């Protein structure tokens, strides 16, 4: 079985958050869930998260503000917006800020799972490219510091 991503679910509506977290866990995901943007950012600094699923309209930090912070500090994390906020401007802004996708509530659970798996595939491919680039950079540095006859 393919490794499943570690998820962070952010939604201020506790019944919705708990129900979705429970269902995702039953599907096999490891899920952390919080009710505020500030709690989410604190958790992101402490934990390894692969994918964030966040609402947009929340007290304190909005989902868009959370997305901006993630893009600034946690580039390797994919973000799926899952919201009842259906304005086209929010969708466009989310995508411009770097969201992987934008899903409307109510949603089809199976479709969300497909989007999670797609986002995780994109994340893994990007992580592999970054690792190869870092290895190439290290090899280039080693080669440039080496000269014939020099003992290392």
Could you say what each language-model-derived stretch is?
Residues 107-117:
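C-terminal output helix
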Residues 28-35, 43:
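Short hydrophobic/Thr-rich beta-strand motif most characteristic of the beta2 strand and flanking loop
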Residues 5, 35-39, 62-65:
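Acidic catalytic/metal-coordinating carboxylates
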Residues 122-152:
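CheY-like receiver
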Residues 58:
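Receiver (REC) domain active-site loop signature in two-component systems and cognate sites
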Residues 42, 64-75:
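Short amphipathic alpha-helix used as the core "switch/output" element in two-component signaling
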């Amino acid at each position: 079985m393919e490794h499943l991503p570690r998820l962070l679910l952010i939604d201020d509506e506790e019944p919705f958050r708990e129900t979705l977290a429970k269902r995702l866990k039953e599907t096999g995901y490891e899920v952390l869930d919080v009710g505020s943007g500030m709690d989410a950012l604190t958790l992101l600094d402490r934990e390894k998260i692969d994918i964030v699923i966040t609402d947009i309209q929340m007290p304190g930090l909005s989902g868009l503000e959370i997305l901006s912070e993630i893009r600034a500090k946690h580039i390797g994390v994919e973000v799926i917006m899952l919201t009842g906020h259906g304005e086209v401007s929010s969708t466009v802004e989310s995508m411009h800020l770097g969201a992987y996708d934008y899903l409307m509530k109510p949603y089809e659970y199976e479709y969300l799972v497909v989007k999670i798996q797609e986002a995780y595939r994109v994340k893994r491919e990007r992580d592999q490219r970054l690792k190869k680039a870092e290895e190439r950079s290290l090899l280039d540095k080693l080669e440039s510091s080496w000269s014939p006859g020099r003992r290392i």
